[in-house]
Amino acid sequence: MIYPYKGKTPQIAASAFIADYVTITGDVVIGEETSIWFNTVIRGDVAPTVIGNRVNIQDNSILHQSPNNPLIIEDGVTVGHQVILHSAIVRKNALIGMGSIILDRAEIGEGAFIGAGSLVPPGKKIPPNTLALGRPAKVVRELTEDDIREMERIRREYVEKGQYYKALQQQRTSCADKKELP
């Protein structure tokens, strides 16, 4: 469901895929070829949420903000299943592992990898191209070429899947308009 909030309506690129049972409210911008997967909630009712191009926000994630602290997700970011992002900045091509929590004013550097289940506390800065793990998250090493290739593969896969599902949605809508279901 897409809901306006106090005069702000989500702006979603035509090429973005928004799965069924996603809720998006208020001051939210979603870029080209971005995919938002099932049961995700993106609330822009406190401050803006800006999501770049070719981002994937996987199932059951929650995105929100604190007053005067927007949530910014740059191009090419992967957000794993059941992630909580709250008033953070996630730089280009980063990957946030499943079940992680990224809190207010944290900044995830370009190409950084946050391991599954990690907690990045308020204000913490994770350097570019590093792997951070734990609760609280600590940098454990620089990323390898294999890590970087795998992150790129995941990004490409989610863009392709998103476009596939987008085409299915359009086909379903077209059939429903004609009162024909496949």
From Swiss-Prot:
Spans traversing the lipid bilayer: none
Presence of keyword Zinc: yes
Which InterPro entries does the record associate with it? Hexapep, LbH_gamma_CA-like, Transf_Hexapept/Carb_Anhydrase, Trimer_LpxA-like_sf
Look up keyword Zinc and say if it applies.
yes
Listed EC numbers = 4.2.1.1
Q: Which cofactor does it need?
A: Mg(2+); Zn(2+)
Binding residues for Mg(2+), per the UniProt record?
H64, H81, H86
Reactions it catalyzes:
hydrogencarbonate + H(+) = CO2 + H2O
Q: What is the UniProt remark on how the cofactor binds and its stoichiometry? A: Either Mg(2+) or Zn(2+) can occupy the active site.
Q: What is the effect of changing N56A?
A: Retains 65% of wild-type activity
Record's keyword terms, sorted? Lyase, Magnesium, Metal-binding, Zinc
Query: How do changes in temperature affect this protein's function?
Result: Highly thermostable. Is active at high temperatures (60 and 80 degrees Celsius).
Phenotypic consequence of R43A: Retains 45% of wild-type activity
Q: Which GO terms describe its molecular function?
A: lyase activity; metal ion binding
Mutating H64A: what's the consequence? Retains 20% of wild-type activity
Q: What is known to happen upon mutating Q58A?
A: Retains 20% of wild-type activity
One short Pfam name that applies is Hexapep
What are the cysteine partners in each disulfide bond? none
Give the similarity note: Belongs to the gamma-class carbonic anhydrase family.
Subunit info? Homotrimer.
**Function as written in the Swiss-Prot or TrEMBL entry:** Reversible hydration of carbon dioxide.
Designated name of the protein: Carbonic anhydrase
